[in-house]
Amino acid sequence: MSQSGDKPLKMVTCGSCGTKVFIPGDLAPLSTVACSKCGQSIMMPMRLRQFDLRGVIGKGGMGNVYRAFDTVLERWVAVKLMRKELVDDPRLLESFYREARACASLNHTNIIHIYTFDEFEGQLYLVMELADQGSLDSKIEKYHRLPELEVLDVGIKIASALDMVLKHSLLHRDIKPANILFNADNEPKLVDFGLARKVEAEHEVEDVAWGTPYYVAPEKIKREPESFLSDMYSLGGTLYHALTGHVPFDAPTVEEVVVAHVQTALTPPNLVVPEITQPTSDALVRVMAKNPAERFLSYDELIMALHAARAQLLVQQYALPETRQAKAKTAWWRL
């Protein structure tokens, strides 16, 4: 620790620009100040057992997620802290426990891996695999829409993850771009199982809980029983948004968006963006059918359709340069 006058200072590394800067040493743990170099927020680190929390990588209603260093295993992890004022709410507390149990029971490359769940001095925390390269939501915000091949790859991987979820008799119930994160290898990771529940409970109609109305299945809106087909619909809406740059249904009010999911015909993706291939467009139209019975009958069937669309897209992409080259040769011989 260094001192300037009577004020203690602490040297930390800015997570945004990598510069080592001094911040007030008496700053409360997890509090932030602006980096003197780049202006981005720098957080006062906090020690939680063997985990050094270094910076915020996500914020939610239940609490924040921090990038942390495990000083025992010497690896970077993510630590989710539940807001202390929520611990007394049995419903929210159960949601936090539900997320931990659900993720811990699943072992899939594209589902965030849980390392431990514990309590320290009244603070509940969840330690998990680090995926700090942004969400699908942030990618859409940055690029407006993503390349078709990338969207198909994400769709195939998350559909496979959801198939694993279903094989463990679980429904995720909150599929949206913000709940698909990316790690350093650009591998998509499904997160946030706070609303997950057992498939056996699918016939129990309960109050609808949405974080956002843009990807919710019609049967959920109508208070009809949910099934894995509801998760499938939400995945379709998520891919639609990433592919076209537009949510499937948009309107001035939440109520109108909700009604559109039930009553308004979906505009096929290739009518929104003409260069989207027909097989990809057809797959998303089917996965977002109003009637669950008209969607794909299984995740395997959906994955096969996305693989077929991907293969045809690659054929077209490879054929296009050859066509141009052939035209160029023809033009040369006509000279």
Predicted stretch roles:
Residues 212-318:
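C-terminal lobe helix-coil module of Hanks-type protein kinase domains
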Residues 121-135, 139:
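Conserved short submotifs of the Hanks-type protein kinase catalytic core
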Residues 54-60, 65:
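Protein kinase glycine-rich loop
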Residues 160-170:
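Protein kinase catalytic-loop region centered on the HRD/HxD motif
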Residues 83-105:
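AlphaC helix of the eukaryotic protein kinase fold
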